[in-house]
Amino acid sequence: MTALSEPRTRLLTRSFALVWALTFVTFFAAFQLFPTVPLRLRELGASLAESGRFMSLFTAGSAIGALFTGPLGDRVGHRRLVVTCALLYACFLGGYALLTSRWGFYLLAFPHGIVWSGLLTATMASLAHVLPEDRRADGLSLYGLASPGGVIVGPLLGLWIFQHGGFAPIGWYLAALFLLLGLLGTTLPADHPHGRAEGFKWPNAAVLAPCLVLFCVALGYGALGSYTAQEGLALGMPLPSAFLSFMAVGMVLMRIIMLKRGFGRRPIRKLPGMLVGAFAGMALLALLPGGMVRHMASALLYGAGYSMLHTLLNAKLLESVDPQRRGSAFGALLFAFDAGIGLGSFSLGWVIGHHGYRLGWGLGAVAMLAALPTALRLGKD
């Protein structure tokens, strides 16, 4: 019997579904908070500029926390960290529902970001225990649908609840949801004995190249989330959020295509092509004429390439990193991503404010192009 005729290992297990659900709900909850917390802060007296402080503090907490929560998961166990962070997440959400002062939001944002990073790194590391080795790329591609799914649905529901019932119901029902997820997290597979690090360990050199690629990509991505809708409003587009919506569509379509086609024996070989696709999408956003059609076309191309970058880099880490250091490796990757988002949103935002949107999009594309030599080297390793 040839290898082609051998049955494929089962991918859709209960444990995989639980890890998928944890990630979906994490992004589903976050992207209900991100658009509604600023609105709540405005109700409490914050100015338009001040209302952005929550996101800045949250991202800072996530970036810094990722460096420590990753190694912590290696030491205490990823399942234990998933459960702990889910329960803490519920406490933060319930706390937001009770707050009547905007300063309370600012005080909670930074530690909440740390818990967010712990939940993401521990969930990603737990995924290694539920994916069969011969189907890791397929599993990561399917798993990658969780975050864009949450991003698509979360803002729509969050804004609807806020408009009809205020902010408190969002905090309360999401807190209850995370309490349930924390309890379900106790049923995740136990960490393997060899997966417990003897002490805190920083990621090795194998993580540096993936971090550099993701950092360069995040520089442009950080500006997209903050400013594409504002450009849409300035241009009078009928759907100002067209770029973000069609980016998510591109992400989902590419993942469906790759699930059908497969990744081959060495998925990382596809990294340079996906990076070029994302670069082309952002370049089109900077160069094409018009408004709505430009946003839609560039977003589809950008989303298709961008979505697979995370999958391919995560698969590379699972393949090359010592199991005892997986948590710290994913933490370093999350740190690089969040740091890039923060720096890109700040620096490209300044460029956009002083020189226009198109120059900002162009510089974001150049930042991605700078990662191409590293991506080519990773594809050959």
Q: How would you label these PLM feature ranges?
A:
Residues W103-P111, V293-L301:
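Paired small-residue
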Residues A66-G77, M254-P267:
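Helix-to-loop junctions at the C-terminal end of transmembrane segments
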Residues F110-A146:
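Cytoplasmic helix-loop-helix junction between adjacent transmembrane helices
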Residues I64-Y96:
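Conserved MFS/SLC helix-loop-helix module at the cytosolic interface between two early adjacent transmembrane helices
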Residues L81-G94, R269-A283:
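Structural signature of the two symmetry-related core transmembrane helices
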Residues T59-L67, V151-I152, M251-I256, G342:
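Residue-level signature of mid-helix packing/kink "hotspots" within the transmembrane helices
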Residues A175-P193, T374-L378:
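C-terminal membrane-cytosol helix-exit motif in multi-pass small-molecule transporters
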Residues R14-L44, L48-G52, Y221-E231:
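Helix-loop boundary and gating motifs at the non-cytosolic
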